[in-house]
Amino acid sequence: MMDYQTAVRGAFFDIAGVAETPDEVAAQARYLDDGLLFLRDGKIIALLPWQEGEAFLHPLKGYVDLRGKLLLPGFVDTHIHYPQTEMIGAFGEQLLEWLTTYTFPVESQFADAEYAQEIAQFFVNQLISHGTTTALVFCTLHPASVEALFSEALRLNMRLIAGKVMMDRHVPDYLCETAGESYEQTRALIRRWHQRGRLGYAITPRFAPTSTPGLLEAVQRLRAEFPDTWLQTHLSENREEIAWVKQLWPEHARYLDVYHHYQLTGERSVFAHGIHLDDAEWQCLHDTGSAVAFCPTSNLFLGSGLFRLPACWQHQVRMGIGSDVGAGTTFSMLRTLGEAYKVGQLQSYRLRASEAFYHATLGGARALRLEEKIGNFQPGKEADFVVIDPAVTPLQRLRIGRCHDIYEQLFVLMTLGDERNISETWVNGERVWCQD
């Protein structure tokens, strides 16, 4: 008998290993139309075909029967702003005006700990109800915003990485701090929360225009003090932003050079957007082991530009998918992948379903340097997964019924699917959400 606590039966799809090309992704794709997943202590013991796994079932334990559903590794969102949840879908501005008009006033509310807790609870529920089990999250500059989010994620034993925004210029006075204050508050939060449960801390300078040299030096010191933390910031999202960086940092030839000068590139650094990078910047990301977060709904909504998917493969840069709520228009990774496909089509790049779901699962985990812990159904991985009902609307039932293989089904899910298709979400081996 296998020493397991829970067994789950259903159809399973994952990418069994990391890949360096889209063809390698396709070669590592694994599909079981009737499989059995064995779990113990929040970890995966084995995924076996039903015919093989049935022999290991304990007669008194049985199994969770999810036949008719498709089980995928939990989605990984590599860039999202939880304080912006309430302002999703704000009309009419591009990046810099959008920050001033909408974002900064909304973020000011998170000085109130009770308000932060209310939004944190709503935000985490949105993540899990959309099948996202791991996220890299921006908070606000208020420590209370970080405390609220980590407290809620800890309650569910989620794998979540987040950090207090750091910014000391070109923001309203009510959101401005000194470099010293930012350093001390961030240091205290790291000591309190980093590696507590499944949580991780991300040092979070908002972006170069809201950072003085002194602030980036403080970030550099924190990186040296706490080398196993993450770093997240924004990079080359908008042409006007890039011109502003050039004006503020004329001594640096390129936007990424500002971060690289302060040693903020590296294996646990994730740069959101990267739409307008040149080849030298792509090469720097590769050489330093840095990652990028591709945020298609946000890039389209703000009119920022089209991310170059092939450049990630060409330069061998790790990449994950980001919803980027609230400039992003959905928490749904299914809908986000559909928009990613359209971004590719506009550049004559065909994003296959296998590649898309790789970026949303194991590829995203790899961008966060978590590929040894999450991202597929390999033995020893943490048991984070999402249960998909592939046909919840009349149109989906018609279309899915005419699919010839799992790849066509996955493509239909990323073009017609949304949160209605999320039947259950499991975190660390426990069901934490299901449809009413």
Task: Name the predicted role of every residue range.
Residues 261-268, 309-398:
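His/Asp/Glu-enriched, well-ordered alpha-helical/loop segment
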Residues 86-118, 164, 168-179, 238-266, ...:
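Active-site gating loops and adjacent loop-to-helix segments of metal-dependent hydrolytic enzymes
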Residues 37, 42, 68, 79, ...:
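Divalent metal-coordination and catalytic microenvironments
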Residues 88-158, 182-195:
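Alpha-helical scaffold segments that flank or form the walls of functional sites
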Residues 144-274:
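Metal-coordinating catalytic core of metallo-dependent amide/deamination hydrolases
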Residues 1-58, 67-70:
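N-terminal metal-binding scaffold of metallo-dependent hydrolase/deaminase domains
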Residues 24-25, 382-436:
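C-terminal cap of metal-dependent C-N hydrolases
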